[in-house]
Amino acid sequence: MIDLYSWCTPNGQKVSIMLEETGLPYEAHGVNIGAGEQFSDFFRSISPNGRIPAIVDRDGPDGTPISVFESGAILIYLAEKAGRFLPAEPRARVAALEWLFWQVGGVGPMFGQANHFRNYATAKVGAELAAYGVERYTKEANRLFAVMDEQLGKAEWLAGADISIADFA
């Protein structure tokens, strides 16, 4: 059984989707990030970075519990555990990992910053600085959308012919 500690955010949703698609048994536990629950001692023992999502696999690789934090690491772990969505063939595996890291290192952070500057920054830094952030991160988000559109024009899924963890990310 896998315990999923998460909240209704893009990073949390990608792991929830992956768990559903793999069919691995799991229990979901809400971590209310608005109330700061991600900073509790309990949660930080699972996710030292104090960010959701995190999982605890009660039946880890050696039969003992293992905790995994960071959405990309969780997707890889779950794919390997389930034997699905991460190809074994080296070129296909590299492609899936490239697109996974493209998402967790680029798309997620850029979209998060665009959202922050669009919705929250004006009150903290003023309209002029907030507008700069909105322009910068929206431009980068649009560039990333174009990269994804181009890739999906070449293949049915981000990493090629088959669905992979890159598509869940």
Named regions from a protein language model:
Residues 18, 140-143, 147:
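Amphipathic alpha-helical segments that form well-ordered structural scaffolds
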Residues 145-159:
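Hydrophobic alpha-helical bundle segments that form small-molecule/ligand-binding pockets
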Residues 1-135, 149:
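GST-like domain detector, emphasizing the conserved glutathione-binding G-site
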